[in-house]
Amino acid sequence: VGDLRALIFDFDGTIAETERSGHRVAYNRAFEALGLDDRWDEATYGELLAVAGGRERLEFYFAGAYPERSETERAELARSVHATKRRLFDDIGPTLHPRPGVVRLVEEATAGGVRVAIATTAAPEGVRAFFAGHPTLGRAFGVVVGGDDVPAKKPSPDIYVLALERLGVAASDALAIEDSAIGLRAARAAGLATLVTPSGYTLHEDFAGAAAICNDLENVDLAYCRALVA
């Protein structure tokens, strides 16, 4: 039996629908900036989201797109594209909007003495770029753990374990909020009850093991979150 002391949010797809019109656009602009002919349409990008982490996603894609290149060359290309993409996302991030109910739930949690954190495979620059457009929301998150902070990305539980450590909260006293099956697996492996709000790219994934599945956070309040960990 838990006593809700923290909400730990995933970022991409959970706090905001960043993938389709955010990260995907930035990747395509990076390809163009580096003189590459590659372009990711919405369907292709949706399939690539099965690979967690931007650089890892690029390496996976380049293995299929450029089989004639060595693994070292492909890894270098992935690093170059990823670095360029991260810079380009700085302009896109602030224009994206939080998903329904996110701001209200974060405000309610903060007012109710429940801490809020972020545990994401996203690069910290991407999170900062988004919050540059939503500074009040950004200030509410006292703990932000990213993929660069841990040895293994989701579905490994490392990110959630570190977030709990930094919060000083037991897994039984926290609720994870995720949008993907990969994220759900990571949170569950860390011992967290998990509320899933599927995003545009994850609607058809298998969310077995979730404490609850909601279209969004519009009708989710702190009392509902408390009940999920009780």
Where is each model-derived feature located?
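Asp-based, Mg2+/Mn2+-dependent phosphohydrolase catalytic module
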Residues: 1-4, 103, 107, 123-230
